[in-house]
């Protein structure tokens, strides 16, 4: 059909309208129109109908944990260990924490000291239809006094790059289950999907930082940052990159290599994931008022 006509029991006007991409257990796009009454009723009030319950997701949320670097790419080096060793140990600890709750399915991009291409890491999450992607890393710097964790989400420039990368494929619209009849409409729907994903990523970043701070884990002063990192480019999977601390700082390296400290850190990350999935869907669709801070 090309049009829909509604007969309203009261005079009204459109207050706002917007498009919701697939998510929260709903596989199709939804066009939402909010109406505001103009005054008194012009006829008998319409019978009140209870809204149908939202479709419930049958499966547990799938969290993909990405242990940064690996194999021929050891990442940054500390006094005792390499970044790839630290990230794999943290990924395995986080997997154990999440599986212990019984509320999640968990998938690792690597489980051993192997090299995995950056774009393959993203493909693993997309192919599995992940609900959340978290990439674990350890920062490095020339000043050994600098320490603290930070969380990265996709920048606006990175979002543009993501769209360009994604639309190189001839059948990109099929990957997002778009109609494929009108390229301009599909592009709008892709942009809407990307925006919703960015909003969800920002929501998780804020929640995660709140839980890290509550656990007394040291944070950088500007702890929420943005960048066009390759592992954040999926247009339809909320994603963050967590720099757990500076491997070049003796105190941070100790926290990252001590088993008890690592388990405590991953428990706070798991708590953040728990809270993220408890947040109402409407909040996740709303753009953050607290955007990522710039670089120091």
Residue ranges and their predicted role:
Residues 61-80:
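Short glycine-rich His-centered loop
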Residues 9, 21, 73, 289-292:
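Intrinsically disordered, low-complexity segments enriched in small/polar residues
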Residues 6, 50-56, 60, 79-296:
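Active-site-proximal helix/loop segments of hydrolytic enzymes
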Residues 37-39, 69, 155-157:
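Short, flexible active-site-adjacent loop segments at beta-strand->alpha-helix junctions, enriched
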Residues 1-63:
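Signal-peptide-cleaved, periplasmic/extracellular N-terminal interaction regions immediately downstream
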Residues 26, 36, 75, 184, ...:
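Intrinsic disorder/low-complexity detector
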Residues 13-17, 40-42, 74, 143, ...:
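Intrinsically disordered, low-complexity acidic/polar segments
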């Amino acid at each position: 059909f090309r049009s829909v006509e509604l007969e309203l029991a009261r005079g009204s006007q459109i207050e706002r309208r917007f498009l919701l991409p697939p998510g929260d257990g709903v596989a199709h796009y939804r066009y939402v129109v909010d109406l505001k009454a103009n005054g008194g009723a012009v006829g008998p009030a319409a019978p009140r109908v209870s809204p149908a319950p939202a479709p419930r997701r049958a499966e547990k949320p799938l969290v993909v944990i990405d242990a940064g670097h690996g194999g021929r790419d050891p990442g940054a080096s500390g006094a005792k260990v390499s970044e790839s060793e630290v990230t794999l140990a943290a990924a395995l600890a986080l997997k154990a924490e999440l599986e212990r709750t019984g509320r999640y399915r968990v998938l690792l991009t690597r489980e051993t000291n192997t090299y995995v291409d950056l774009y393959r890491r993203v493909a693993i999450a997309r192919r599995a239809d992940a609900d959340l992607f978290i990439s674990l890393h350890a920062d490095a710097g020339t000043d050994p006094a600098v320490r603290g964790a930070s969380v990265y989400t996709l920048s606006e420039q990175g979002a543009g790059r993501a769209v360009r990368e994604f639309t190189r494929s001839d059948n990109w619209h099929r990957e997002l289950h778009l109609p494929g009849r009108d390229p301009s409409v599909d592009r709008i729907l892709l942009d809407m999907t990307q925006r919703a994903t960015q909003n969800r990523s920002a929501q998780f970043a804020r929640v995660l930082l709140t839980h890290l701070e509550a656990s007394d884990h040291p944070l950088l002063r500007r702890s929420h940052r943005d960048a066009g990192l390759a592992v954040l480019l999926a247009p339809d999977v909320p994603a963050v990159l967590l720099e757990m601390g500076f491997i070049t700082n003796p105190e941070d390296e100790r926290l990252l290599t001590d088993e008890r400290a690592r388990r405590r850190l991953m428990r706070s990350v798991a708590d953040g994931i728990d809270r993220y999935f408890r947040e109402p869907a409407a909040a996740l669709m709303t753009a953050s008022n607290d955007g990522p801070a710039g670089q120091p």
